[in-house]
């Protein structure tokens, strides 16, 4: 009898351990990697039980869950994660998926006109990724065929999202383009990571970006001489001037230079040539980003606007240039602000980088 009772006790203990183990395993499977947001201002994260609450801007709220049966709090749109299929609307969004090695999740994009990424182009060619059309002209049937779990949208674009809403697909705003801090924009890889189950990978990748960026920023902060820099060029009678409260102006500051509109509190505005010249005539450097067909040159810059030769930076051959026809700027730069920063530091303060450094985006115009 004692032996029998002993056997029962052992059996009960084993069952209890097994049940506890199952609970722990289930808890581990359902748990979400912690996400900390340090620089980005466009989204915030709160974890509650088995629900992750993600607020995007002031109007959009999402409850990320592993179990479809989980009830989302009032005011939150439930999204079962990890998602397996999505559509990207911008190169910035696509850059997040690229750096996370998650092209398999992307089932649709707007188009391939200015696309550089060979893997994405191959997927479009063989049908794994479809082209849904440009903003305002989306093809609802193609969107439905892509069968996305969610669609990441950019409110800055022309829209056309109402037709997609009617299909019943969850639209998730991606506000990375609004970030004023370069690291804040890059941190949106954590946002995408939460939706595709790559929180850990996103955190590790971002930590590397952050470390490299801040290390170089600290070196540049110690320079004794800070050159001045202006940005942009004339288009259709106006010069779109980046404001002092802007992503690019912040990069200039972090690279050890002073932007000519450093005290402005706007992100950007269109100015007449005369006003921009008054601000920029004596700037040491002049940054230009465009999509010139062919090899851009000082001759081409003068041909586009004869008065350009009046700038000090033009005369001294200190124009900093990137051609988007030749460089996948918007496909890479949003998630590599550390590289972008290094390009500028290499020009402003070459002694702070290795002598054989080869720029990725910007270089002095020849």
Predicted regions and their residues:
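Sec-dependent bacterial lipoprotein signal peptides
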Residues: 1-15
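Bacterial Sec-exported substrate-binding components of ABC uptake systems
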Residues: 17-94, 201-230, 315, 328, ...
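A short, structured surface patch at a secondary-structure boundary
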Residues: 52, 63-144, 150-152
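Short, structured coil segments at secondary-structure junctions
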Residues: 102, 167-170, 255, 315
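Proline-aspartate-enriched helix->loop->beta-strand connector
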Residues: 129-134, 139-156, 169, 273-287
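Extracytoplasmic substrate-binding proteins
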Residues: 139, 145, 149-239, 262-263, ...
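A ligand-binding cleft/hinge motif common to bilobed small-molecule-binding domains
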Residues: 157-166, 290-302
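Flexible, glycine-rich surface segments
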Residues: 211, 216-300
């Amino acid at each position: 009898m004692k032996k029998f009772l002993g056997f029962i006790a052992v059996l009960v203990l084993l069952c209890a351990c097994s049940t506890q183990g199952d609970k722990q395993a289930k808890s581990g499977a359902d748990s979400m990697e912690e996400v900390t947001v340090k620089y980005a201002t466009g989204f915030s994260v709160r974890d509650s039980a088995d629900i992750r609450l993600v607020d995007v801007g002031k109007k959009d709220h999402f409850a990320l869950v592993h179990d479809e049966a989980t009830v989302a709090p009032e005011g939150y749109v439930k999204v079962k994660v990890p998602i397996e299929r999505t559509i990207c609307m911008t190169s910035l969004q696509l850059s997040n998926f690229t750096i996370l090695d998650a092209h398999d999740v992307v089932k649709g994009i707007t188009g391939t006109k200015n696309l550089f990424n060979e893997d994405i182009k191959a997927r479009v060619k063989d049908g794994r990724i479809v082209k849904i059309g440009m903003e305002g002209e989306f093809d609802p049937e193609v969107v439905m065929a892509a069968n996305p779990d969610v669609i990441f949208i950019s409110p800055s674009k022309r829209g056309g999202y109402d037709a997609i809403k009617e299909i019943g697909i969850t639209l998730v705003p991606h506000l990375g383009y609004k970030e004023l801090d370069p690291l804040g924009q890059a941190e949106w890889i954590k946002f995408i990571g939460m939706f595709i189950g790559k929180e850990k990978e996103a955190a590790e990748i971002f930590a590397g970006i952050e470390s490299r960026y801040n290390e170089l920023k600290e070196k540049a902060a110690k320079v004794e001489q800070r050159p001045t820099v202006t940005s942009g060029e004339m288009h259709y009678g106006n010069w779109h001037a980046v404001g002092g409260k802007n992503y690019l102006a912040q990069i200039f500051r972090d690279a050890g230079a002073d932007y000519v509109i450093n005290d402005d509190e706007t992100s950007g505005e269109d100015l007449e040539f005369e006003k921009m010249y008054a601000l920029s005539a004596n700037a040491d450097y002049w940054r230009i980003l465009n999509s010139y067909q062919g090899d851009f040159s000082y001759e081409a810059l003068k041909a586009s606007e004869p008065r350009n030769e009046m700038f000090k930076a033009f005369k001294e051959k200190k124009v900093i240039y990137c051609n988007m026809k030749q460089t996948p700027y918007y496909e890479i730069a949003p998630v590599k602000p550390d590289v972008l920063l290094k390009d500028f530091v290499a020009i402003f303060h070459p002694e702070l980088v290795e002598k054989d450094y080869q720029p990725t985006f910007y270089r002095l115009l020849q």
